[in-house]
Design a protein with these regions (language model features):
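Intrinsically disordered, low-structural-confidence terminal and linker regions
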Residues: 1-104
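Short linear motifs at secondary-structure transitions and domain/linker junctions
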Residues: 86-87, 137-138, 157, 253-255
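Glycine/serine-rich phosphate-binding loop and adjoining beta1-alpha1 elements at the start
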Residues: 100, 106-248
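Glycine-rich adenosine-cofactor-binding loop
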Residues: 248-258
């Protein structure tokens, strides 16, 4: 039987960013928290990171939030917006019929996102990291709130476009189109470095979603086994001439730690 308070609270999942600045949730020592990140931004870049974060909020709230977000940036190395972590409902995969969505496909995505952030599942749930130390679902809690609001409104003839946790909006599509198109970690490997990625991540313009964190479909180690198998199968088809009906039987794979 569903917990009545949880079901009632779940009705608020589509509220988006509250009109008024919410109270700061208590720091929860019962969950693991991500360690502070390296300080990689200059003073001018920190101002840019603040502007990027404040774009989600009305101008009249910027003065109140800027100091808090700067403190997060200076102590943690990223702006997480802990103040906006929802507490009215339990963060877990609820029965799909409990989600206040117009589209069951959208409700299933909401369920998957909440599963990725479930404290019983995620590595650092309050920092929106599912696994691997940096496998992020979103960059901050404002993005989570906006995405849940969009998914509540979505119909089966719309597509939500995501860019490293940032929702670009709902776009007209068709019932045969994807409900969500996700991109993460948009870096050019041969023209970039780890330091450059960390800088852009601290600025709030890119995130690393790992294989199944930023795509909302983490199912534990079996997901990585599945993804790795598909990767190897496609490599064998491309380089060994396997057709679509052949498996990897008889193929020797040598790895240096994959």
């Amino acid at each position: 039987m569903a917990d009545k308070s949880s079901v009632s609270g779940l009705k608020l999942i589509g509220e988006g960013i509250p009109e008024n600045i919410p109270s700061m949730p208590d720091w929860d020592e019962s969950v693991d928290h991500a360690p502070p990140r390296r300080q990689v931004l200059t003073a001018n870049e920190k101002q840019l990171a603040l502007r990027n974060a404040l774009r989600y909020f009305p101008t009249e709230q910027h003065a109140s939030l800027a100091a808090e977000f700067l403190q997060e940036l200076n102590t943690f190395g990223r702006i997480i917006m802990w103040r906006y972590r929802p507490t009215a409902y339990e963060m877990k995969a609820h029965p799909i019929q409990q989600y206040p969505a117009k589209s069951q496909q959208a409700a299933s995505i909401m369920l998957m996102i909440q599963n990725n952030l479930d404290p019983a599942v995620a590595q650092f749930p309050h920092e929106l990291i599912t696994y691997g130390g940096n496998g992020s679902v979103f960059q901050n809690w404002a993005q989570y709130r906006l995405v849940m609001s969009y998914l509540c409104k979505m119909t089966d003839e719309q597509t939500l476009v995501m860019y490293s946790g940032h929702p670009l909006g709902l776009f007209p599509s068709s019932s045969d189109s994807p409900r969500v198109i996700v991109t993460n970690g948009m870096m050019i490997p041969n023209a970039s470095t780890q330091d450059n990625y960390e800088r852009l991540n601290a600025l709030g313009v890119t995130q690393y979603g790992q294989m199944t964190a930023g795509s909302y479909m983490y199912i534990g180690p079996q997901g990585i086994v599945h993804g790795t198998t598909i990767t190897l199968l496609n490599a064998a088809r491309a380089h060994l001439g396997l057709n679509g009906d052949e498996g990897l039987g008889g193929v020797t794979f040598v790895t240096a730690g994959l």
